């Protein structure tokens, strides 16, 4: 069966650990595997890190820079070199590619989100493999994805992918870092119920040249599986394993997807937008929005956290602060603070002007899986 597959490869797999130079044999093996998948009829998107690492190597820098402006400059140097290597290798196999550089802004603005989706769809229809990276050179700190694990999960949600492969420097998820804890236990399959209870010492440390660690991969897997995408963590040095996994072999760690039938708009609310505040809700409101498909009314709001404007996204939390849903609000934070706990027919009297009966309409609300 033809499937849509997103593959993310990190800096630790793309580069040699000591020098930061490109690991050309690994990249060549990856290119060969992805071309094989295309020839089998699958739709392929590659999310590739490495621009900053390659830039550092090209400029003979011994460590990754800390300052944002310097990282952006070095990314500009490295991205050109990286995409050229990919193009040369794919070209030898007759496989066309495209470079797609994204910032978080493209996913926050609804029109840009739709345009990005349409562009990916057109590229895939043409048989092209898009190679995606964050546009580090122009991204601002507040609107950065933070790591390409998150970016790959958001792209997988955007294009309704069937699979997301997170290629890393270990063969699967373990109960602790196997490089530090010799008796760490391997984890091969995680269903949605187990994922909610999963407790592993994942750490937050990436490689010298990259930004990701196992913690970011677990966060990405939560996003992707929540959007209905089966997710796999496996070794980036063995790209041929992708074919074996698709054929049913138990390699790496697989995270089973949740069953979701959300509209494209609700996926955008859940994964594209950045929440700018929180609303704490009572149990009745939680039940209404999560289990009865209703809108959020002011009466069910206990507390407002953060400053935000109308039409921005917020997290909808239970009384303990656990996020249960996300939604686009009809009022700003000051207005909601005034009307919280009151019935809808009291809103105009409290504010002195008329407004929506709902704080978040159900069409602008996405419940967590």
Swiss-Prot record:
<feature type="binding site">
    <location>
        <position position="49"/>
    </location>
    <ligand>
        <name>substrate</name>
    </ligand>
</feature>
<dbReference type="InterPro" id="IPR019797">
    <property type="entry name" value="Glutamate_5-kinase_CS"/>
</dbReference>
<feature type="domain" description="PUA">
    <location>
        <begin position="276"/>
        <end position="354"/>
    </location>
</feature>
<dbReference type="GO" id="GO:0005829">
    <property type="term" value="C:cytosol"/>
</dbReference>
<feature type="binding site">
    <location>
        <position position="148"/>
    </location>
    <ligand>
        <name>substrate</name>
    </ligand>
</feature>
<keyword id="KW-0547">Nucleotide-binding</keyword>
<dbReference type="InterPro" id="IPR041739">
    <property type="entry name" value="G5K_ProB"/>
</dbReference>
<feature type="binding site">
    <location>
        <position position="8"/>
    </location>
    <ligand>
        <name>ATP</name>
    </ligand>
</feature>
<keyword id="KW-0808">Transferase</keyword>
<keyword id="KW-0963">Cytoplasm</keyword>
<dbReference type="InterPro" id="IPR001048">
    <property type="entry name" value="Asp/Glu/Uridylate_kinase"/>
</dbReference>
<comment type="pathway">
    <text>Amino-acid biosynthesis; L-proline biosynthesis; L-glutamate 5-semialdehyde from L-glutamate: step 1/2.</text>
</comment>
<dbReference type="GO" id="GO:0003723">
    <property type="term" value="F:RNA binding"/>
</dbReference>
<keyword id="KW-0641">Proline biosynthesis</keyword>
<dbReference type="InterPro" id="IPR036393">
    <property type="entry name" value="AceGlu_kinase-like_sf"/>
</dbReference>
<dbReference type="GO" id="GO:0005524">
    <property type="term" value="F:ATP binding"/>
</dbReference>
<comment type="similarity">
    <text>Belongs to the glutamate 5-kinase family.</text>
</comment>
<feature type="binding site">
    <location>
        <begin position="211"/>
        <end position="217"/>
    </location>
    <ligand>
        <name>ATP</name>
    </ligand>
</feature>
<dbReference type="InterPro" id="IPR015947">
    <property type="entry name" value="PUA-like_sf"/>
</dbReference>
<comment type="function">
    <text>Catalyzes the transfer of a phosphate group to glutamate to form L-glutamate 5-phosphate.</text>
</comment>
<dbReference type="InterPro" id="IPR036974">
    <property type="entry name" value="PUA_sf"/>
</dbReference>
<feature type="binding site">
    <location>
        <position position="136"/>
    </location>
    <ligand>
        <name>substrate</name>
    </ligand>
</feature>
<dbReference type="GO" id="GO:0055129">
    <property type="term" value="P:L-proline biosynthetic process"/>
</dbReference>
<dbReference type="Pfam" id="PF01472">
    <property type="entry name" value="PUA"/>
</dbReference>
<dbReference type="InterPro" id="IPR002478">
    <property type="entry name" value="PUA"/>
</dbReference>
<dbReference type="GO" id="GO:0004349">
    <property type="term" value="F:glutamate 5-kinase activity"/>
</dbReference>
<keyword id="KW-0067">ATP-binding</keyword>
<keyword id="KW-0418">Kinase</keyword>
<protein>
    <recommendedName>
        <fullName>Glutamate 5-kinase</fullName>
        <ecNumber>2.7.2.11</ecNumber>
    </recommendedName>
</protein>
<dbReference type="InterPro" id="IPR011529">
    <property type="entry name" value="Glu_5kinase"/>
</dbReference>
<dbReference type="Pfam" id="PF00696">
    <property type="entry name" value="AA_kinase"/>
</dbReference>
<dbReference type="InterPro" id="IPR001057">
    <property type="entry name" value="Glu/AcGlu_kinase"/>
</dbReference>
<feature type="binding site">
    <location>
        <begin position="168"/>
        <end position="169"/>
    </location>
    <ligand>
        <name>ATP</name>
    </ligand>
</feature>
<dbReference type="InterPro" id="IPR005715">
    <property type="entry name" value="Glu_5kinase/COase_Synthase"/>
</dbReference>
<keyword id="KW-0028">Amino-acid biosynthesis</keyword>
């Amino acid at each position: 069966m033809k499937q849509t597959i997103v593959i993310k490869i990190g800096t630790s797999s793309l580069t040699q650990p000591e020098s930061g130079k490109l690991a050309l044999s690994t990249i060549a093996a990856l290119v060969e595997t992805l071309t094989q998948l295309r020839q089998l009829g699958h739709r392929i998107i590659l999310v590739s890190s490495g621009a900053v690492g390659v830039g550092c190597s090209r400029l003979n820098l011994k460590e990754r820079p800390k300052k944002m402006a310097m990282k952006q400059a070095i990314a500009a140097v490295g991205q050109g070199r990286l995409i050229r290597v990919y193009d040369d290798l794919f070209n030898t196999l007759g496989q066309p590619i495209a470079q797609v550089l994204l910032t978080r802004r493209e996913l926050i603005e609804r029109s840009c989100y739709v345009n990005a989706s349409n562009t990916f769809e057109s590229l895939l229809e043409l048989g092209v493999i898009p190679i995606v990276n964050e546009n580090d050179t122009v991204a601002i700190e507040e609107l950065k994805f933070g790591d390409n694990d998150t970016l790959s999960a958001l792209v997988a949600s955007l294009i309704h992918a069937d699979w997301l492969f997170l290629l890393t420097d270990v063969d699967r998820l373990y109960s602790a870092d196997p490089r530090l804890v010799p008796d760490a236990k391997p984890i091969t399959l995680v269903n949605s119920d187990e994922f909610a209870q999963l407790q592993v010492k994942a750490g937050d440390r990436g490689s010298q040249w990259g930004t990701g660690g196992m913690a970011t991969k677990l966060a990405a897997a939560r996003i992707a599986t929540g959007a209905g995408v089966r997710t796999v963590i496996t070794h980036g040095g063995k790209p041929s394993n992708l074919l074996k996994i698709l054929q049913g072999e138990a390699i790496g760690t697989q995270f089973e997807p949740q069953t979701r039938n959300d509209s494209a708009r609700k996926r955008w609310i859940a994964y594209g937008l950045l929440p700018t505040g929180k609303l704490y809700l009572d149990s009745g409101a939680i039940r209404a929005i999560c289990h009865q498909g209703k809108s959020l009314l002011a009466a069910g709001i206990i507390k407002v956290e953060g400053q935000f404007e109308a039409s921005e996204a917020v997290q909808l939390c239970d009384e303990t602060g656990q996020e249960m849903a996300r939604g686009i609000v009809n009022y700003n934070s000051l207005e909601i603070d005034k009307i919280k706990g009151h019935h809808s027919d009291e809103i105009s009297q409290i504010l002195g002007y008329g407004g929506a009966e709902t704080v978040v309409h159900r069409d602008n609300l996405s419940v967590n899986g």
